[in-house]
UniProtKB/Swiss-Prot annotation:
It comes from the Bacteria. The chain crosses the membrane at residues 4-24, 29-49, 55-75, 87-107, 115-135, 152-172, 177-197, 207-227, 230-250, 268-288, 291-311, 326-346, 356-376. Interacts with the regulatory subunit KefG. GO terms for molecular function: glutathione-regulated potassium exporter activity. It is found in: Cell inner membrane. Its main location: membrane. This is Glutathione-regulated potassium-efflux system protein KefB. HAMAP family: K_H_efflux_KefB. Residues 400-519 form the RCK N-terminal domain. GO terms for biological process: proton transmembrane transport. InterPro entries: Cation/H_exchanger_TM, K/H_exchanger, K_H_efflux_KefB, Na+/solute_symporter_sf, NAD(P)-bd_dom_sf, RCK_N.
Length: 601
């Protein structure tokens, strides 16, 4: 692809994403499906703006590579070892059972047994990119279902290696003699990567960090990720597996969070590019001519994988609600099918349009997953939050809540306990099923659901409640809820959790005045105790704390109009100097009144 063509393709990708993804999110079908639809629109079977799909699809696999690196950073070797039974137990069982059933069904439709074996293995794999993205969106990452799902995906990545080696054998094109010297060299190279990464990565990053130049640190991170991927590809292994191992090796390092911050923007853009490329690869010509076959095959593919996954989750001991999420999020075909089915040896096994039909089925199965997960969420909402006898709004009881709490993590739990201790009627909305089940065991009135859905808020009693407390982890969810409540429930008193000053500024701009910065009060309290240990009178330390709170809040409000402007840095420095001067004057005045107590809002 020429340079000008590449630039044009980049502009088209960005334009399609900017238009399609917000529309998809507004329609409630999720960003992933928005990317896929954008790809169909600009691809060769849509408006035809881009025709070189294979090259772009190969490049866009870097999105999965970056994602696996970040996942590796979140897992240390000890945690990975604890997952070994689910990786090699549930993961292996899922691949073998799904491949056997799907391969057998392919043989009944005219596939040779060799093509059916390759097809069954390819269809048994799930989309790592889509599954992990959806698990994060649904808050499943830290749940038991999410951990089991990740284990299955990791085994599938490991299974890529023997699957690629199997295809030439089935096609009858494998060498008669195995070059054991080459195999041994690859094993030694892989072992060298593990040992070198274990002992060299941290000193190298320590040296780079000592330069104090952030851009160099970002460049080193990109070099590590892309270098690991290239090295593994040269060995004939999965690129994603290589970057995952690099991430695990750095999971316990002091640079873990800085690495994640450096990689995250690239990961998001490249993942979007990957989903757009998958949409572009959808062959609508094959779909039109074999519509019935494709429709049935997609339905069978999703149903078989869901059934296998659900049964394995039951044997593993997951709760029924988590089984459905686990089965749904892994029910699609995956990106590995594009690699496996496109091998020259594979192309000799498939007849006529068989390969194209399988790829269309895989692509469409990926498009069903966001819709399937949306349906599962609604089903679980009805099951976990049963309707009352009147048949009116689901699961609303006669004693209407006074307060709705959105999010019941550690922050939300403290608020809920305080309100319940004072006999306040609360309703809690939480989208992590494991948290819902756990809190219900302790007597909390917690309900499963995504509070950014308007109907769910209505069902929770937002029209009758007096206040809503928003404790979401994601700032985007917080601001979406604020906007929704202001538009549809203007009577509600909105109280919100702010993770830092930037989010506090956004809340102030939105008109929310009742918010709490999650670490601010606890940091002030610890600072007050530090002043006492340094010899300050307890009353004076208390007054110092109150003065600082008042002045900091004043500065927060004054800086709110310019928090996104280029003048922010100079204004912050000016405000800091002013804060120090006022603080010194106040403390000199109050030093003569050690026993006084003031209240500041």
């Amino acid at each position: 692809m020429a340079g000008s063509d590449l630039l044009l393709a980049g502009v088209l990708f960005l334009f399609a994403a900017v238009i399609a993804v917000p529309l998809a999110s507004r329609l409630g079908i999720g960003a992933v499906l928005g990317y896929l639809l954008a790809g169909i629109a600009i691809g060769p079977w849509g408006l035809g703006f881009i025709s070189d799909v294979d090259e772009i699809l190969h490049f866009s696999e870097l999105g999965v590579v970056f994602l696996m690196f970040i996942i590796g950073l979140e897992l240390n070797p000890a945690k990975l070892w604890r997952l070994r039974s689910s990786i090699f137990g549930v993961g292996a069982a899922q691949v073998m059972l799904s491949a056997a059933i799907l391969g057998g069904l392919l043989m009944t439709t005219g596939f040779s047994w060799q093509a059916a074996v390759v097809g069954g293995i390819g269809l048994a794999m799930s989309s790592t990119a889509m599954a992990l993205q959806l698990m994060r969106e649904k808050g499943m990452s830290r749940s038991e279902a999410g951990q089991l799902g990740f284990s299955v995906l990791l085994f599938q990545d490991l299974a890529v290696i023997p699957a690629l080696a199997l295809v030439p054998l089935l096609a009858g094109s494998a060498d008669e003699h195995v070059n054991w010297l080459t195999v041994g060299m690859k094993v030694l190279a892989f072992a060298g990567m593990l040992i070198g990464g274990r002992y060299l990565l941290r000193p190298v990053f320590r040296f780079i960090a000592s330069s104090g130049v952030r851009e160099v640190f970002t460049a080193a991170t990109l070099l590590l990720v892309l270098g690991s991927a290239l090295f593994m590809e040269a060995l004939g292994l999965s690129m994603a597996l290589g970057t995952f191992i690099a991430g695990v090796l750095l999971a316990e390092s002091e640079y873990r969070h800085e690495l994640e911050i450096a990689i995250d923007p690239f990961k998001g853009l490249l993942l979007g590019l990957f989903f757009i490329s998958v949409g572009m690869a959808l062959n609508l010509g094959v779909l039109y001519t074999h519509l019935l076959w494709v429709a049935v095959s997609v339905a069978v593919l999703v149903a078989v994988k869901m059934l296998v996954l659900y049964l394995l989750a039951r044997l593993y001991g997951l709760r029924s609600s988590e089984r459905m999420q686990f089965a749904g999020v892994l029910s699609q075909g995956g990106e590995f099918a594009f690699v496996l089915f496109s091998l020259p040896a594979s192309q000799r096994l498939f007849l006529h349009d068989q390969m194209a039909l399988l790829l269309v089925a895989v692509t469409l199965s990926m498009m069903t997953t966001p819709l399937l997960m949306k349906g599962i969420d609604k089903l679980l909402s009805r099951r976990l939050n049963p309707a009352d006898d009147t048949g009116e709004a689901p699961w609303v009881e006669d004693d209407k809540p006074q307060v709705i709490i959105v999010g019941f993590g550690r922050f939300g739990q403290v608020i809920g306990r305080l309100l319940m201790a004072n006999k306040m009627r609360i309703t809690v909305l939480e989208r992590d099923i494991s948290a819902v089940n756990l809190m219900r065991n302790y007597g909390y009135k917690v309900y499963f659901g995504d509070a950014t859905q308007l109907e769910l808020l209505r069902s929770a009693g937002a029209e009758e409640a007096q206040s809503i407390v928003i404790t979401c982890n994601e700032p985007e969810d917080t601001m979406r809820l604020v906007e929704m409540c202001q538009q549809h429930f203007p009577h509600l008193h909105i109280l919100a959790r702010a993770r830092g000053r930037v989010e506090a500024h956004e809340l102030l701009q939105a008109g929310v005045t009742q918010f709490s910065r999650e670490t601010f009060s606890s940091a002030l309290e610890l600072g007050r105790k530090a002043l006492i240990t340094l010899g300050m009178h307890p009353h004076q330390a208390q007054r110092a704390q109150l003065h600082f709170r008042r002045l900091d809040m004043r500065m927060l409000r004054e800086l709110m109009p310019v928090h996104t402007d280029t003048v922010q840095i100079s204004r912050v420095r000016e405000a800091r100097r002013e804060l120090e001067e006022i603080f010194q004057r106040e403390m000199q005045k109050e030093s003569r009144q050690l026993d006084g107590w003031d209240e500041f809002e």
